[in-house]
Amino acid sequence: MITIDTSRKLGPIKPVHGVNNGPTSFGGLTDLSRSYKAAGFPYARMHDPEYPHPTAVDIPQIFPDFSADETDPANYVFENTDAALKAIVDCGTQIIYRLGTSIEHTVRKLYTDVPADMDKWARICIQIIRHYNEGWANGFHWNIRHWEIWNEPDLNQDDMWKGTPEDYFRLYVISSKAIKAAFPHLLVGGPALAYKMDFCRSFLEHIRRENAPLDFFSWHMYNNRIADFAARAADIRALLDANGYAQI
């Protein structure tokens, strides 16, 4: 039962109907932009685009040859991602860009390895941000503010992350510091937690010790019980506060 006290004014209700991805799929073969815009989605998080065969957003799709020169625009393939993001921008929705790769439920994993060179991976992220916010490589000036580092590195299987928790912590520290150094006005966060509260605790303790930036903490659940979501939110809030992130 929900009780509403109409005598109290608390201000505007925070919009909570954000979505994953945009109104188009498979290069525009499906385009739901009219309905998408009408829904007024405040945010679109870019993860698992065109699942299960993505051709956009993921770093391995944009920068397919990791051995190439990351400063050369010729080594980037932006076209599909440009189109996907433009459809979202045209609908008036803000983008949360997940830097990383899509989940792989296949037997053979292609892109969930730990980056061979984390510093270079961070530099690639910076070039992608420049493309969408500063016009680099025939890019745009979309002022995408939220940049999320990876997705679900806490999963048991290697569908999302083949490394250890410590490997992810290191990737987060390196890339978050590099991004904030290049773009101090942007928001960097993660880890897009799926399940494990012990991972959450260790992550927060580690980045606090390393003085790594955390502008937002991202998490989600696979559940249909509202009470469980509320309990998880309270648990994460307590961990954030205990580790000095009360401002998030």
Could you describe each region identified by the protein language model?
Residues 59-61, 110-112, 161-165, 202-205, ...:
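Short, glycine/charged-enriched secondary-structure capping and boundary segments
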Residues 1-146, 166-190, 212, 241-246:
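Non-catalytic accessory regions flanking glycosidase/transglycosidase catalytic cores in CAZymes
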Residues 28-29, 54, 105-109, 156-159, ...:
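Extracytoplasmic/secreted cell-surface and envelope-processing proteins
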Residues 116, 162-167, 194, 224-227:
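Alpha-helix capping and helix-loop boundary segments enriched in small/acidic/polar residues
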Residues 141, 147-151, 156-163:
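N-terminal/domain-start segments enriched in small and hydrophobic, helix-friendly residues
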Residues 102, 154, 195:
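Short, glycine/serine-rich, charged loops/turns that create anion-binding
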Residues 97, 125, 143-151, 186, ...:
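Aromatic- and acid-rich polysaccharide-binding/catalytic face
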